[in-house]
Structure formats: structure tokens, C-alpha cells
Design a protein with these regions (language model features):
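Short, conserved secondary-structure transition motifs
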Residues: 159-166, 256-266, 374-383
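His/Glu-rich zincin catalytic helix
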Residues: 31-103, 123-126, 136-137, 208-310, ...
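M16 family metallopeptidases and their MPP-like homologs
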Residues: 52, 57-85, 97-143, 172-197, ...
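Short, polar/flexible loop-turn hinges at active-site or ligand-entry regions and domain interfaces
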Residues: 91-94, 143-150
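Bacterial N-terminal signal peptides
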Residues: 17-30
Length: 445
């Protein structure tokens, strides 16, 4: 299991990197958080996108996402979506792999694709003057990927080599095993990249069918930032996505049920013992989300958190300890993670459990809540709005969470509205559950 909302194979070709990086730096400086104006653009063919215009630098960044992802991989063909993302720039339309990538390079563009459990996503950055040519190539990749057999075999072997290398990594082995335990037979319990065995079963027809059933306009979310206006963007959207099917043919995915109360223990010859706790959380759209968000920050979300103070600062048990809310389409979880010396593993477990129990029973103080509100309001721009790429990513994330365009402006008010009693209530609701635990390291721990 991977704790990040986005995991997969990202195959990117970057050219003129220093040139683009220079303009990206200028764009960062030109987009203060309080000046971001989000427009909703609807193309002539009805494709929706959110746009932040910035003509101060001649760049355009776009992120797009198709709902589905690796959860749509058929049983026995795990890794299909991930493999597909590695093939989009390996030839499209009349262009073979070399020709396609040469044109991307010559245009100074960056194009990448990735797959997670919930979506297949793409990113593109380009000079505004090359926009038509670059998006013409993107249109070929999105609509008419070639999936040539030689490219399939080559990219498949790269993924296989990566899997085989990761099978020597205790962290990866433990993460995959924990995912199987935590999610059971749910698609989230499968590795996004598949297995060596499952990858061998994937054919060109499988790739073509997955592309046909998953890439459709009704599952598409788009965020664009840079030197482009609404009219130009509408034309670009239709050029790239307008010929896709109107409706996807996705297999329904049930909500996942966390296997709480389980302990997964694995022995490895390694210098430290790693520990993870998983508790339930609430979805992004839940009315109690901000109360849970604040509670998590106070518990383990930063250098001033209770876990950091008790585990690292007071006792020196670990270099780092943290908690985070992991929000996916079909499950929400709160994960606590740390690594410690083997002889201190049981003490670390004990201290973490004590801090969780204290939060569940008594909640935070008024002072802790006030500090958390101040930090989380002030850090949003730094974490989400520091570059054209991060802004485009944020635009997609807000739409996928079904949040309004004025969310960034209203977010501070939503945080301030949370009361101490609400945080205490959600802490008791979530943290009194018996967690799922992963512990791996030397046998003596």
C-alpha cells in the first residue's frame, strides 16, 4: 500500500529544462495566493475546465485526470492502467516512438502520465508560442495511442525490472503486504504497478480496450494555468479531448472496509523498526472534515504536534513521527508512521497509543486548536500554490472533491468556524477504534 493519493509509473520526456524552469520561477513570483482568480471555462463541445490566467510569462501548464485508474484493472491483469501510462508518449497516430518524442523535445515541452487507484492523470507544460503544436501531439496521445508491440515489450520490461528491484526493499514488501491485509480483496489491496506474473498476461488488445472504456469526457477533470485566455482554452480543450467518447464504461468499485484491529508483523535484517497505525477518517465532503483535519494536525501533523513532542523531542525515540489523512475515492484513513531503534519499538508503540488515547478521550486544548488553525490557514498557499504545476494540480483536486471555485477564498472561514467541541467529538469518533498496525524490522523488535 502506498500512502500517497497519487502512485504509478510516470514516463516523462523533458527538454529545454533550464529555459522552462526560469519561466516557472517567474510564474511563481507572479501568482500570489490572494490574487488567484479561477475561471470556469466550457468549450464549444461542452468540456469543462478551471483556468487561472497569467500572461506575465509565456508558459501554459495543464493537468487532466480521468476517473477510474488502477481500480479498473481486470483481475489477473493488475498493472494494466499503469503500463498504459508509460506508453502514451511511445507513439501516437502516424508518429512512432522516436518521432513523437523528437517532436516533444524540439518544442521544448514536458509531457507525463501516471496512474493511481482512482484515476489516470496527465501533465503538460509548454511555451505559449508552441501551444497548438504541443496540444496537437497531446491530442494524438490521448485519442490515438499506437501501443506498438515493441514499445509494449520494452516498457513492460522496465516495469518488471522495477518490481523485481522493489522486491528486495523491505519497505515495499511490507507496504504491499499491509495493503493486502488492510483492504482485502478490494482493488486498493493490489499494487498499482501489478506483479511480474500479471504484467505478462497483458496484451495490446487489453490496452486498447482499457483506453476505449476509461478515456471519456464524462470522467475528465482539467486545470490550466498560464498564458492562455478562456476562448483559446475552449478551442484547445476541444482539439485535445473533443473527440473522446461521451461516456466511460467503468466497472463499479465498492467502498473499501479497513481491516481495523489487525497487526501485520514482518522480520527483516535492517537497522530500524518501522511502525504504522491506521485509523478511520472521514471523506473530504463530510461535514466533519475540517474538525478531523485540525485534530490530525494537532496529533501528528507537524513539528509542534503532540506525537513529535512526545516521541522525538522528549524521548528521542525517532527522527520523525507524523500522522496524515489519506483520502481516496472509496476509503478515508488516518495513518501514523514512525521508525525507531529495534530496542525502542515497543516503547514507541506504547507512547503513540497513549497519545492517541489522550486525544480520543480529552481532545485538544483551546491553545492547540488556535495554533493549528493559524498554521493550516497560512500554509495552504505554500503547499498548494507555489508554481503553475501545483496550481493546476490544485484546480483538479478541488474539482474532484466537488468544491466550489471560491473555496480558496472561503477556506480560512471554514477552518475558523470549527469549534473545540467539534474537534473533541471527531477525535473520540475516529480514534477510539482499534487500529490496523504494521510493524517491520529486526526480529527482536
Amino acid at each position: 500500500m502506498n500512502t500517497s493519493i497519487m502512485r504509478g509509473f510516470a514516463h516523462a520526456r523533458t527538454a529545454c529544462a533550464a529555459f522552462i524552469a526560469f519561466f516557472l520561477l517567474l510564474m511563481v513570483c507572479s501568482l500570489p495566493a490572494n490574487a488567484i482568480e479561477i475561471q470556469e471555462v466550457v468549450s464549444p463541445k461542452g468540456i469543462h475546465a478551471w483556468l487561472v490566467e497569467d500572461s506575465s510569462v509565456p508558459l501554459v501548464s495543464m493537468r487532466f485526470s480521468f476517473k477510474g485508474g488502477t481500480s479498473q484493472d481486470p483481475a489477473g491483469k493488475e498493472g494494466l492502467a499503469n503500463l498504459m501510462t508509460g506508453l502514451f508518449d511511445e507513439g501516437a497516430g502516424d508518429l512512432d516512438s522516436d518521432s513523437f518524442q523528437e517532436q516533444i523535445d524540439n518544442l521544448g515541452a514536458e509531457m507525463s502520465f501516471s496512474a493511481s487507484g482512482d484515476s489516470v492523470s496527465g501533465n503538460i507544460r509548454m511555451l505559449a508560442e508552441n501551444r497548438d503544436a504541443v496540444t496537437g501531439l497531446l491530442a494524438l496521445a490521448v485519442n490515438n495511442p499506437r501501443f506498438d508491440q515493441d514499445a509494449i515489450d520494452r516498457i513492460r520490461q522496465q516495469v518488471v525490472a522495477s518490481i523485481e528491484a522493489s522486491q528486495r526493499n523491505p519497505s515495499t514488501i511490507a507496504s504491499r503486504k499491509f495493503g493486502e491485509v488492510l483492504y482485502g480483496n478490494h482493488p486498493y489491496g493490489r499494487p498499482d504497478e501489478g506483479t511480474v506474473k500479471s504484467l505478462q498476461t497483458i496484451s495490446r488488445d487489453d490496452l486498447l480496450n482499457f483506453h476505449r472504456t476509461n478515456f471519456a469526457r464524462d470522467r475528465l477533470t482539467i486545470g490550466v494555468v498560464g498564458s492562455i485566455d478562456a476562448k483559446e482554452l475552449g478551442e484547445m480543450l476541444d482539439r485535445v479531448f473533443g473527440d473522446l467518447p461521451a461516456m466511460a464504461e467503468l466497472v463499479p468499485v465498492p467502498d473499501a472496509k479497513l481491516a481495523l484491529g489487525t497487526t501485520t508483523s514482518l522480520s527483516f535484517d535492517m537497522p530500524q523498526t518501522s511502525i504504522s497505525f491506521v485509523y478511520p477518517a472521514v471523506p473530504r465532503k463530510d461535514p466533519e472534515f475540517f474538525a478531523a483535519y485540525l485534530m490530525n494536525h494537532i496529533l501528528g501533523g507537524g513539528f509542534t504536534s503532540r506525537l513529535y513532542a512526545e516521541v522525538r523531542e522528549k524521548r528521542g525515540l525517532a527522527y520523525s513521527v507524523s500522522s496524515a489523512m489519506v483520502l481516496r475515492d472509496h476509503v478515508s484513513a488516518l495513518m501514523i508512521s514512525t521508525a525507531t531503534r529495534p530496542e525502542k519499538a515497543q516503547e514507541s508503540l506504547k507512547i503513540i497509543r497513549e497519545q492517541v488515547a489522550a486525544m480520543a478521550n480529552d481532545g485538544p486544548t483551546e491553545a492547540e486548536l488556535a495554533a493549528a488553525k493559524s498554521y493550516l490557514k497560512g500554509s495552504y498557499a505554500v503547499n498548494n500554490l507555489t508554481s503553475s504545476v501545483s496550481i493546476a494540480d490544485t484546480l483538479v483536486g478541488l474539482q474532484e472533491a466537488e468544491l466550489p471555485r471560491d473555496y480558496i477564498d472561503k477556506r480560512g472561514e471554514l477552518i475558523d468556524a470549527v469549534t473545540l467541541d467539534q474537534v473533541k467529538t471527531i477525535a473520540k469518533k475516529l480514534l477510539q477504534a482499534e487500529p490496523a498496525i504494521l510493524i517491520y524490522g529486526p526480529a527482536q523488535s
